[in-house]
């Protein structure tokens, strides 16, 4: 069983010995009686019944039959309280640890002689490498993107040799992971830790080259199912945000067979115990039996994992996502761990599971993993970021990696002595883990050199690895690898089947989860249904039956247009299915690759459970539209119409699902999906009737699902008896004439053919969706390798002879360990600034009481988060803001920094004695957020240039600004990676600690006097944290005021601070003031409080401080630390200092600036403009794909409408040409709007951070986003030229330069306003899903009222206003009149005989001489959409705090 971690809560045992002894005797007697009753049960019942003893405190929850007394219960019928009671008994220790439970389970196995299965993992001569670009060639610019495509083609054709450098990630490493021993994996950044874990889990990316052997119990990875044997716990937290923590773990337990594993164990165990007359522990027996039964709702295994991971307090909270509120980052990390360890796998490969956790929580989790390893003889290899000394000591063995080489592997207790033998000693008050991660660093190694009589010479990782191989530990390891391995044939340990439970059970689990997700997304589905109703009402009132009559072909064409629009709307209403599918893929891929379930078990519920939704959509549209428009009134035709809509909606959902699963990326799906939809739309039989389709497109016509739907719906309507009137233009009926004129069949059986084909397509698309899920892998973008070889003549230290490099060699300078500018005690850097003191006194902060708490009966209207908080932040003083989770650290920092946009603030906040003015304060303050949010497509240097240009005063020269940026880069050790692309967090670009240093540097280049830092070391390993803290310390030494919130830090990081503000839950201060040398002031203060446990020698003061001030400690001591502090001399000293510093110095005035921002709006605009141009230039997946799609779409259009531009013989020819232009405008415009949304969405998150930092006002930013306008304009211009020139000459419009130019102008303006509309949709909605849904409604209305489906002359007066505000209508008007408005060729058609321009004027309402007005209107639409986007950016914030 692999679910193991530590109970986080601490319970204090109450020692009442006499009462305790008598209670124990009573419980024992009761247990004997219950066990006797149990033994009288038939064998079948004994497997499902267990003895549940009374709660130790007599306050147990009900179990379906009583409270607190012992019972013989059927474990299958236990409710939630009953399960909790069983769990309490199993875990009942003073520490709520799992040691006793696991020891009891192991003892039960030992008692009957059953062995616990064991797995030994070996890897020998393992090398992992890849080929990468370096320097500027690695940047994803448009040129490089095209270059890469051409290069791949030439290489595959053997016409070019690869121009890449070999990067060795793991270099000939060997080792053994023993069962029953906890193994820690340590190493600095980029040392290959994650790659080693992935290699052992058989999860390496297919692009990586691997050599060497990995074996489990001597069996190669291809001889058994690795994923069911081992669990790789990733650094990335991919979860479905709508599910709660409990639901996430329940699903994982069902899929991994957590209960089934217990059943297998119990079968043999119970039989052997019965044979030998062994009576098991009632608590252990009850736990194991309860865990062995699968439950739909209440699962004991899930409750156990929740408890030991400390997630029980948030079990029913949604996990959440980037835009949806959920659990904290640390809790989400524990959910990731729980999801994998809940199953039966006994080999755990755990990759940095402690990110975001305080050291106390990490200790408890690792401690219980240790219990699991030692008792159940499991195999665990765990990498940790900053293991505290007490956590480090829990491990048995250590693997130390550096630059892809193993430099130590062996017992953890010998590692210090080993490095001492190499000449490196551990300093006092230094954690061993921190020492080990720094001793290989070129910059840090010298400080650990023990022999001061000799000069230190740097010992490289390669040299250390060679020395290790020759050491006693290396030879012992080699001997281990040479020996044979047992348990080779253990089928229980090394399963060969892929799935742990029957596939029917997996399908049930997936169905249950999908039902939950549908219920959680009910707003989205309700919104979409209401949208169908809304568009249906508009459609029915537009084609109102009082205005249409089934008497002639002209009216019939309007009926046909209405039917066609209904089909198109139902089809495109499923577009959001593609967005939702793509958003769910990361979680699916994780679970698929871990064999949670097969792909079809995921796709089947997606398909089946959308059937009722399709039915509802069809019913709503049919009921709203059918009789209001006045279609054929017989009931059978109404229900056939509804069936057809249901069929096309099901087909569309399958189509969009399939497109999402194949594309796997929103931009690619939108772009290439649009090309597919374009062909389906054009060849559906309405825009281009069958008789006009070119021979080379006949095949596409016959496979277009829309064609079958168009035929079926047309036959259903026009074969009705009311259309049997003989036409005035021939001997056939009006209905037959309409069908024949549009090349549609007249046989009624085509309805059933259409429905059958649509349903067949639905099945086909869902099968393809399933196959895509099963066989395609996620699109992975490689990390940019951009060392400092760009632009200044420096190289990458690459051996061009062998062309082979390790990570350390390629990134030799990436962490700034060479060539660093010395800046130990700079007094102010290049730019002067004013040192400032911040005082705050009796600060209170309230928010409105959450509705959930009001519903539980809480009477107060406000919830207080900060309570009378007072303190001082001074120049040259580094202050730590510390407290348990929920104590209000970040809240206080946000209040002081002016980042809170809601709530109620009370108290006195002063800057150097003057009242704080937020508009002024924002100019002199920096705020380093916990989340490192940056534009992915810019480099490090560009990020700093952008910040400095916008935030430094405009009177600073460019040269001075450049020198200042250079100095800051040196200060934070980023100068060696100045040309590295920032990239997307966790995917590409900078490492975590490099991003953190960049976040700090972005604030430093603003030359602030006061800097707030929220968790600057969170998510970093010890070495990276040391680099960041060195940066922070250097910043303080320049004379600035710096305050940091921080989790429980290591000793050396904690003691880098000068002062401390310690808070407890409820936002109350329990210590404020100096830390002292070796934290002596703080230690003396707390040890002066009676009965506080004194600190032991060498113990981390930060850990001790937080342990002795917990709520449990307060209860034990009977005191309130906040009250103790308020009555202390320490508090009085702080108060006196606040009073002293709250008085302004004589002759000083409050800070004043002439404007809110450092730069004027024109400068803000130009800087934002340049940044957006860089973002676009380096977004090839957006721009290259878009231009490629435009080329493909142009060729499709040109070939479908080949040479129809000069064909002007009938009204049908004119309408065909109009259809071509209508489809071109609509489809390419919609594609532009859809593909720009992901780009804008990413940059919006960056905007929120930059706007909060007062970099610029919202208008210049939004104006520069027009470069999502102005930057977009060159790309739209190229797009226009590609599409316009190809289609103009292929369609064969009139060879007239004026008409060509006008055609290009209209296309350019159309693409522009569609692009701006896509930005508006993002600006007005909180998520991309919602933007997609809202957009589809607008696209439908623009399609309906564009003047193509229903001419302007036939639009009712109550809707004509919408026609004039429909941008597509103006595009169509402009393009048609520019091409045909002056044509006098005579044409004939139903009800018309005259010239072309007369037809345009009389039937379509297009008048000549409107060219200038039409261009002006289209420009106005572009300006209007841009203005709405600018206003939305300024006024709406979907991340309000």
UniProtKB/Swiss-Prot annotation:
Listed transmembrane segments: 523-543, 558-578, 615-635, 642-662, 668-688, 751-771, 1184-1204, 1214-1234, 1271-1291, 1300-1320, 1330-1350, 1355-1375, 1413-1433
GO MF, one example: ATP binding
Positions of the ABC transporter domain: 154-428, 838-1090
UniProt keywords, alphabetically: ATP-binding, Membrane, Nucleotide-binding, Repeat, Transmembrane, Transmembrane helix, Transport
Membrane topology listed for this record: Multi-pass membrane protein
Region Disordered, residue ranges: 52-71
Sequence ranges of Gly residues compositional bias: 58-69
Annotated ATP 1 binding sites: 187-194
Record bears the keyword Chaperone: no
GO cellular component: plasma membrane
Described function: May be a general defense protein.
Protein name per its UniProtKB record: ABC transporter G family member 51
Source organism (scientific name): Oryza sativa subsp. japonica (Rice)
Name of the encoding gene: ABCG51
């Amino acid at each position: 069983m692999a679910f193991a971690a530590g109970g986080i809560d601490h319970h204090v045992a109450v020692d009442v010995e006499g009462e305790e002894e008598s209670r124990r005797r009573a419980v024992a007697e009761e247990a004997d009686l219950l066990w006797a009753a149990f033994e009288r049960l038939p064998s079948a019942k004994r497997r499902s019944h267990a003895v549940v003893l009374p709660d130790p405190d007599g306050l147990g929850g009900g179990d379906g039959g009583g409270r607190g007394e012992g019972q013989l219960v059927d474990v299958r019928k236990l409710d939630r309280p009953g399960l909790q009671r069983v769990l309490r008994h199993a875990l009942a220790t003073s520490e709520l640890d799992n040691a006793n439970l696991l020891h009891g389970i192991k003892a039960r196995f030992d008692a009957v002689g059953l062995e616990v299965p064991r797995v030994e993992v070996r890897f020998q001569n393992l090398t992992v490498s890849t080929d990468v670009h370096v320097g500027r060639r690695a940047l994803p610019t448009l040129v490089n993107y095209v270059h890469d495509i051409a290069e791949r083609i030439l290489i595959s054709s053997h016409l070019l040799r690869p121009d890449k450098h070999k990067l060795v990630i793991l270099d000939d490493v060997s080792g053994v992971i023993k069962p029953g021993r906890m193994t820690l994996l340590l190493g600095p950044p980029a040392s290959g830790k994650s790659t080693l874990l992935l290699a052992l889990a058989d999860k390496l990316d297919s692009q990586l080259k691997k050599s060497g052997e990995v074996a489990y119990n001597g069996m190669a990875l291809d001889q058994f199912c690795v994923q069911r044997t081992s669990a790789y716990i990733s650094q990335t937290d991919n979860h479905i945000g709508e599910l709660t923590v409990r639901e996430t773990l329940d699903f994982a337990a069902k899929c991994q067979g957590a209960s089934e594993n217990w059943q297998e164990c119990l079968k043999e165990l119970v039989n052997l115990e019965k044979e030998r007359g062994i009576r098991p522990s009632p608590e252990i027996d009850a736990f194991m039996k309860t865990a062995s039964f699968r439950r739909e709702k209440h699962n004991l295994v899930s409750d156990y994992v929740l408890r030991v991971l400390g997630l029980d307090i948030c079990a029913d909270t949604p996990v959440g996502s980037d835009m949806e509120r959920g659990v904290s980052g640390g809790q989400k990390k524990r959910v990731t761990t729980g999801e994998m360890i809940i199953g039966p796998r006994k080999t755990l490969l755990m990759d940095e599971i402690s990110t975001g956790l305080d050291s106390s929580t990490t200790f408890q989790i690792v401690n219980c993993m240790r219990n699991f390893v030692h008792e159940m003889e499991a195999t665990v290899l765990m990498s940790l970021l900053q293991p505290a000394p007490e956590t480090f000591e829990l491990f048995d063995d250590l693997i130390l990696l550096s630059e892809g080489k193993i430099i130590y592997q062996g017992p953890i207790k010998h590692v210090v002595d080993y490095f001492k033998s190499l000449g490196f000693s551990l300093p006092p008050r230094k954690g061993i883990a921190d020492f080990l991660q720094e001793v290989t660093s070129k910059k840090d190694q010298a400080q650990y050199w023990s022999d001061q009589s000799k000069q230190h010479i740097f010992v490289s990782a390669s040299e250390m690895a060679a020395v290790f191989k020759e050491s006693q530990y290396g030879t012992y390891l080699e001997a281990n690898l040479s020996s044979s391995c047992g348990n080779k044939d253990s089928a229980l340990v090394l399963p060969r089947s892929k799935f742990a439970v029957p596939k029917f059970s997996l399908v049930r689990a997936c169905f249950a989860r999908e039902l939950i997700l549908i219920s959680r997304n009910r707003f989205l589905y309700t919104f979409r249904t209401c949208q169908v109703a809304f568009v249906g009402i508009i459609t029915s009132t537009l084609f109102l039956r009082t205005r249409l009559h089934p008497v002639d072909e002209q009216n019939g064409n309007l009926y046909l247009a209405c039917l066609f629009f209904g089909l198109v709307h139902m089809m495109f209403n499923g577009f959001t299915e593609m967005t939702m599918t793509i958003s769910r893929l990361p979680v699916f891929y994780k679970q698929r690759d871990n064999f949670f379930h097969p792909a079809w078990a995921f796709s089947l519920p997606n398909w089946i459970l959308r059937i009722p939704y399709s039915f509802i959509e069809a019913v709503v549209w049919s009921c709203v539209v059918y009789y209001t428009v006045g279609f054929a009134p017989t009931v059978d035709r109404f229900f056939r119409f509804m069936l057809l809509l249901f069929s096309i909606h099901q087909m569309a959902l399958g189509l969009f699902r399939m497109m999402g699963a194949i594309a796997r990326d929103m931009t690619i799906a939108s772009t290439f999906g649009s090309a597919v939809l374009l062909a389906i739309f054009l060849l559906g039989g309405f825009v281009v009737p069958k008789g006009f389709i070119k021979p080379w497109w006949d095949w596409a016509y016959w496979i277009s699902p829309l064609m079958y739907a168009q035929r079926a719906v047309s036959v259903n309507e026009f074969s009705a008896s009311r259309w049997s009137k003989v036409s005035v233009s021939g001997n056939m009926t009006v209905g037959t004439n309409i069908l024949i004129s549009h090349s549609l069949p007249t046989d009624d059986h085509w309805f059933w053919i259409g429905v059958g084909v649509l349903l067949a397509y639905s099945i086909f698309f869902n099968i393809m969706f399933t196959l895509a899920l099963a066989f395609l892998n996620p699109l992975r973008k490689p990390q940019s390798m951009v060392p400092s070889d760009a632009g200044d003549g420096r190289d990458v230290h690459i051996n061009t002879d062998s062309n082979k490099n390790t990570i350390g060699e390629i990134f030799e300078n990436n962490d700034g360990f060479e060539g660093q500018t010395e800046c130990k005690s700079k007094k102010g850097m290049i730019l002067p600034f004013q040192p400032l003191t911040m005082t705050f006194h009796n600060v209170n902060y309230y928010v409105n009481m959450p509705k959930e708490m009001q519903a539980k009966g809480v009477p107060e209207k406000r919830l207080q988060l900060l309570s009378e908080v007072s303190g001082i932040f001074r120049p040259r003083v580094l202050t730590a803001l510390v407290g348990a989770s929920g104590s209000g650290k970040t809240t206080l920092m946000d209040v002081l920094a002016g980042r809170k946009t809601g709530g109620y603030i009370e108290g006195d906040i002063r800057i150097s004695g003057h009242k704080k003015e937020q508009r002024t304060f924002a100019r002199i303050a920096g705020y380093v957020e916990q989340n490192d949010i940056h534009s992915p497509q810019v480099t490090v240097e560009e990020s700093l240039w952008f910040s400095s240009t916008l935030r430094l005063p405009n009177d600073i020269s460019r040269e001075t600004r450049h020198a200042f940026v250079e100095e800051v880069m040196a200060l934070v050790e980023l100068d060696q990676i100045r040309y590295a692309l920032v990239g997307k967090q966790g995917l590409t670009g900078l490492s975590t600690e490099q991003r953190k240093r960049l976040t700090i540097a972005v604030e430093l280049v603003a030359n602030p006097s006061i800097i707030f830092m929220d968790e600057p070391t969170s998510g970093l390993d010890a070495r990276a944290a040391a680099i960041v803290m060195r940066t922070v310390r250097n910043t303080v030494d320049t004379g600035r005021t710096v305050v940091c919130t921080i989790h429980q830090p290591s000793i050396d990081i904690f003691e880098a601070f000068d002062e401390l503000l310690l808070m407890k839950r409820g936002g109350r201060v329990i210590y404020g003031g100096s830390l002292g040398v070796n934290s002596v002031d703080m230690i003396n203060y707390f040890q002066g409080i009676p009965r506080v446990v004194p600190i032991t020698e060498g113990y981390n003061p930060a850990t001790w401080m937080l342990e002795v001030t917990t709520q449990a400690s307060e209860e034990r001591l009977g005191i309130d630390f906040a009250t103790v502090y308020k009555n202390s001399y320490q508090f009085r000293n702080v108060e006196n200092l606040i009073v002293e510093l709250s008085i302004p110095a004589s002759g000083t005035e409050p800070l004043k600036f002439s404007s809110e921002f450092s730069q004027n709006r024109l400068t803000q605009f130009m800087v934002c403009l340049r940044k957006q141009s860089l973002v676009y230039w380096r977004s090839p997946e957006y721009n290259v794909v878009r231009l490629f799609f435009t080329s493909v779409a142009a060729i499709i259009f040109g070939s479908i409408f080949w040479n129809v531009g000069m064909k002007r013989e009938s009204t049908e020819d004119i309408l065909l040409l109009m259809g071509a232009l209508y489809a071109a405008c609509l489809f390419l415009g919609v594609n532009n709007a859809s593909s720009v949304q992901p780009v804008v969405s990413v940059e919006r998150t960056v905007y929120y951070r930059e706007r909060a930092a007062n970099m610029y006002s919202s208008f210049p930013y939004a104006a520069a986003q027009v470069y999502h306008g102005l930057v977009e304009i060159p790309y739209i211009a190229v797009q226009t030229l590609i599409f316009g020139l190809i289609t103009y000459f292929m369609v064969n419009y009139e060879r007239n330069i004026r008409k060509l130019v006008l055609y290009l102008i209209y296309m350019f303006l159309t693409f522009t306003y569609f692009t701006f509309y896509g930005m508006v949709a993002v600006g007005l909605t909180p998520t991309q899903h919602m933007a997609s849904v809202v957009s589809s409604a607008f696209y439908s209305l623009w399609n309906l009222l564009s003047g193509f489906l229903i001419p302007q002359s036939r639009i009712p007066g109550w809707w004509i206003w919408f026609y004039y505000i429909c941008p597509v209508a103006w595009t169509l008007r402009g393009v048609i009149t520019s091409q045909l408005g002056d044509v006098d060729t005579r044409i004939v058609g139903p009800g018309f005989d005259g010239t072309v321009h007369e037809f345009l004027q009389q039937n379509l309402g297009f008048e000549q001489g409107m060219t200038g007005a039409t261009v002006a209107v289209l420009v106005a639409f572009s300006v209007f959409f841009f203005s709405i986007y600018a206003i939305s950016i300024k006024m709406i914030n979907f991340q309000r705090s």
